[in-house]
Amino acid sequence: MSRMPFDRQKIVEAVKEAKARAKPRNFTQSVEVAVNLKDIDLKRPENRFKLEVVLPHGRGKDVKIAVIADGAVAEAARRLGLDVISSAELEEIAQSPRQARKLAKKYDFFIAEAPLMPKIGRYLGKYLGPRNKMPVVVPPTMSNLEPIVEKLKKTVRIQLKNNPVVHAPVGTEKMSDEEIAENIETVLNAIIGKLERGESQIKSVYVKTTMGPAVKVKG
């Protein structure tokens, strides 16, 4: 693993300051990290990436998951109290772009049984793809979704596309500074692992709450 460009204490200090500078709100604010990159040509497709990162301390809040399935997979989803979208409902949603957009916005993650993926790609691909929310695919015989769901609850999806900056949620203001800092380290390590020249391509890192100002992590 590459040497971290920032030590843990510097990250903890930035988290502490970001939380302190956030005005109290009537909701629990998320904490986000923004990683600015340099010396990277995003016109070359091989330099762009999508990543799934499992945060050691989770996201600190509930994650909304929908399951697109019939049969065994749908039953497994209902047992876990997850929202289920049947193949028939999928056909209905396909007729309404407004409904499809609403669906893509409402859920953080989708799980889908493999046989429905061609339809999902056709009907929902243009709404889920740009949001980096294409489903986790499972076989139609799967009867236990719990391991996948537990992993998704701790997962963040990040992508580097047209601009040299990567954003990721890394917790909430109610989590300890150390927990958030460790989550940030995990995200940074994942990003460094995708960069051709590793940590030397990280220009700066900022931490902020949903409504608060961005605080730079001192290098």
From Swiss-Prot:
CDD domains referenced in this protein's UniProt entry, alphabetically: Ribosomal_L1
Disulfide bridge map: none
GO cellular component: large ribosomal subunit
Keywords noted in UniProt: Repressor, Ribonucleoprotein, Ribosomal protein, RNA-binding, rRNA-binding, Translation regulation, tRNA-binding
Molecular function GO terms recorded: rRNA binding; structural constituent of ribosome; tRNA binding
InterPro entries attached to this UniProt entry: Ribosomal_uL1, Ribosomal_uL1-like, Ribosomal_uL1/biogenesis, Ribosomal_uL1_3-a/b-sand, Ribosomal_uL1_arc, Ribosomal_uL1_CS
SUPFAM superfamilies, per the entry: Ribosomal protein L1
Recorded superkingdom: Archaea
GO biological process, one term: translation
Gene3D superfamilies documented for this protein: 3.30.190.20, 3.40.50.790
Family: Belongs to the universal ribosomal protein uL1 family.
Function: Binds directly to 23S rRNA. Probably involved in E site tRNA release.
Protein's name in the database: Large ribosomal subunit protein uL1
Source species taxonomy: Archaea, Methanobacteriati, Methanobacteriota, Thermococci, Thermococcales
Gene: rpl1
